[in-house]
């Protein structure tokens, strides 16, 4: 089955690669319209997925991720229309020159070809990824979580219907509808057809893909994000940033997981932190250094375990520890971070510049929340993932990250001397 899907996707990718922007945008607008027209079918499939998930004991937080409503589906359709407004990177000339040997050489953006995406219980990802791949002339094979396989199947059917209406190959967007996990292992070996694989899930999925895939893999999305509050901060402003980074959306990969506080301000700052976190319902996992300053405060406090510093909580939990200086903060981030998003709160320009130079994460912030690591917030539009590696993309992956380039040389019956 997957062999046939791969062949069909590769054939479709050749057709997509030569489409102009107007043709791709027409397909996207048709998809957006049909999502609204066929919303009842998609929502009915989602109801069945929700019922199974609830019966299997899925938490309310995860059920909410899985849930589609008419309002949410309309918002997803609106997001597809927004992709139409983004600049198409395909065909852009990155650079070019006339060489001494007479060759006019340029580097031009082109689609990757076929993208494979493995993701979990978020039905909106199906549309987000499909729309970005189509905009960049890529075919895509989707493998959503077993919790959403009915919703994904119904959604992809609508997308394929829209593609057919636009005289484009339905195989440009395909989904593996079976929840059989063995098919994931088979997908990882389709290097003959798939040019890039993107896993969007937990550490286990990323490890599986890195170890088993014969396809180039873009990993990321696992965010053990830090904020370092140095000794020059404005307490009120810093507390506002810390609170927002933790509680705005705790389940997001760019939410704050560990707070590092300069030891010299601990006796004054941590009691204020306790009040702020108590009001937001955050449990503090305090080190032995931080604990004495937090035990008398209103926040729920427990002793941190060493392993917690590597935890992506994705909940109203926050590690808190003290460091002597910037060197110690950077060392902690290097040991426990995932190169996702890390920030410093400071009024010291030299500390800010050092932090930016020395913290090797895909996004580094000065006096700003880690929550900004997002395609929409970066002005990239939607994103297919957040990459924490260095090749071939890093940070939020928008349209450009779904392209590569080719060298094109022009001559006048030119031969090499």
Swiss-Prot record:
InterPro entries: Ald_DH/histidinol_DH, Ald_DH_C, Ald_DH_N, Aldehyde_DH_dom, G-glutamylP_reductase_CS, Glu-5-SA_DH, GPR_dom. The keyword Cytoplasm applies. One of its GO terms (cellular component) is cytoplasm. Its EC number is 1.2.1.41. The keyword Cytoplasm applies. It catalyses: L-glutamate 5-semialdehyde + phosphate + NADP(+) = L-glutamyl 5-phosphate + NADPH + H(+). One of its GO terms (molecular function) is NADP binding. It comes from the Bacteria. Keywords: Amino-acid biosynthesis, Cytoplasm, NADP, Oxidoreductase, Proline biosynthesis. Gene3D superfamilies: Aldehyde Dehydrogenase, Chain A, domain 1, Aldehyde Dehydrogenase, Chain A, domain 2. It is found in: Cytoplasm. Belongs to the gamma-glutamyl phosphate reductase family. Catalyzes the NADPH-dependent reduction of L-glutamate 5-phosphate into L-glutamate 5-semialdehyde and phosphate. The product spontaneously undergoes cyclization to form 1-pyrroline-5-carboxylate. This is Gamma-glutamyl phosphate reductase.
């Amino acid at each position: 089955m997957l062999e046939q899907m791969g062949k069909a996707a590769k054939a479709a990718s050749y057709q997509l690669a030569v489409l102009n922007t107007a043709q791709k945008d027409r397909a996207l607008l048709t998809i957006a319209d049909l999502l609204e027209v066929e919303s009842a079918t998609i929502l009915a499939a989602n109801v069945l997925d929700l019922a199974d998930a609830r019966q299997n004991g899925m938490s309310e937080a995860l059920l909410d991720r899985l849930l589609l409503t008419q309002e949410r589906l309309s918002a997803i359709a609106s997001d597809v229309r927004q992709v139409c407004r983004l600049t198409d990177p395909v065909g852009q000339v990155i650079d070019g020159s006339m060489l001494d040997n007479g060759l006019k050489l340029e580097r031009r953006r082109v689609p990757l070809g076929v993208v494979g995406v493995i993701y979990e219980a978020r039905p909106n990802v199906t549309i987000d990824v499909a729309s970005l791949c189509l905009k960049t002339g890529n075919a895509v094979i989707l493998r959503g979580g077993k919790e959403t396989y009915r919703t994904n199947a119904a959604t992809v059917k609508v997308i394929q219907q829209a593609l057919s209406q636009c005289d484009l190959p339905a195989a440009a967007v395909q989904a593996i509808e079976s929840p059989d996990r063995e098919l994931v292992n088979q997908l990882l070996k389709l290097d003959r057809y798939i040019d890039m694989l993107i896993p969007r899930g937990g550490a286990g999925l990323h490890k599986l893909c890195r170890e088993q895939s014969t396809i180039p893999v873009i990993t990321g999305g696992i965010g053990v994000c830090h904020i370092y509050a140095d000794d020059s901060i404005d307490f009120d402003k810093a507390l506002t940033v810390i609170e927002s980074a933790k509680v705005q959306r705790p389940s997001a990969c760019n939410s704050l997981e560990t707070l590092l506080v300069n030891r010299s301000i601990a006796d004054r700052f941590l009691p204020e932190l306790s009040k702020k976190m108590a009001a937001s319902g955050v449990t503090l996992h305090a080190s032995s250094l931080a604990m004495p300053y937090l035990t008398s405060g209103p926040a729920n406090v427990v002793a941190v375990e060493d392993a917690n510093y590597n935890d992506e909580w994705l909940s109203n939990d926050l590690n808190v520890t003290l460091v002597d200086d910037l060197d110690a903060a950077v060392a902690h981030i290097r040991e426990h971070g995932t190169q996702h998003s890390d920030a410093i709160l400071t009024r010291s320009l030299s500390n800010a510049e050092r932090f930016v130079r020395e913290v090797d994460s895909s996004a580094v912030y000065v006096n700003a929340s880690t929550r900004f690591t997002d395609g929409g917030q970066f002005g990239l539009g939607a994103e297919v993932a957040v990459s924490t590696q260095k090749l071939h993309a890093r940070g939020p992956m928008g349209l450009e990250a779904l392209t590569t380039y080719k060298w094109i040389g022009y001559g006048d019956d030119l031969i090499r001397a």
